[in-house]
Amino acid sequence: MLRWLLLAGLLSCVVVLLALDAEAAKRPVAAPSNVATKVNFPPYPPYMLYPVRVGIVQRQSSARIAVWSDGAVFIDFTPIFELKKGLVYQIADGRITEYATGRFCNLPVDKRARIASRDFQVWCNSRWWRGSLEIIQFPGKMTVINLLDIENYLMGVVPSEMPASWNIEALKAQAVAARSYAYAHLDGGSKWLRNEGYDLVPDVRDQAYKGRAAETAKTNMAVAQTQGVILKDSGRVKPGFYRAWVGDFFENLNMRKKPVPNKQLEQITGVPNIVGVTVRSWDANANATDIQIMGKKKTREVYGVKLASMLGLQTAGILDVKGEGESWVFTYRGPGNGARGLSQHGANMLADRGWNWQQILQQYYQDPDGRLRLEYMDKYHTVKATKPPEPVAKDKTDETE
């Protein structure tokens, strides 16, 4: 009897162990440790002169990723988990899990995990990004950072900030402004780096950045043809602040106004008893070329630049004149717009009027002392930028207005 009881107990143990083994076989298992033999590419793109870190997922509980070609998860420079082309992975709860099989790997809390593919194109949360990804873990949350070279970053910024259908010279000006902004906010210039671990965010708090899907051949050409060029003022980087349409076209040209009392204008021009001041013609760049000053007994026509000098205006040209009470209000373009930055719509209008990208940038960022320079970033070969030529007026038959 005892023998039968012992045999029955032994059979029960075998059944339980088999059941546990079957259950264990259904559970996801950690990745094998031989990944290093299959991966022959680094965890981030080579030849990055100026790496940019963009926080594309900010303190969220999860994210989804995929790779364009075979990839891997790295800790430092060591690959620990293979990523297969065409499969989707979830990052959550301190691990990366392959949806199709349940295969996973745990991520260390004290180190950044890096995700890269052979061609350095990675999908994350419905968008493709150039470069690679970095994962930072916080208690119950995680951040995904897109790591890439500044020039590749700009390929996703320029079409996100300015329509690709716009004039190529405006797109080039946008590329330089965006590059200057990014360059000025790398490392110590970033307000996000200390607490969040990245340089920039991909929205209007810094610059719109929609990744690889936003790219076009035309905007990529604008980036390539201005490669490495930034704005500098007295040897310091000038952050390329810019904005969309604000007010009318004249406001985008850094419009300023100066009221001149009637008596003062009479003394300056030598026309007594002024009854009217009229702009009779403009050049293709909106500068007044012929201003008529009418008195009761005398009329004089003055070239716009000369009258601006007579009035003591620091300007490239007078734009308009209107009478207000006992004064004449002259609207003119200021010497630059370093505080407000590039107007995107204004830049496109100027480009359509024949301005090149250097002239557009000089218009919006130059200060009264003329210290603005277009120079290469420090690690690019240094070329002293020459002062851009003055805009050339087109024939009236070529004007768009």
Predicted regions and their residues:
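Conserved, single-site charged/polar hotspot
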Residues: L2-E401
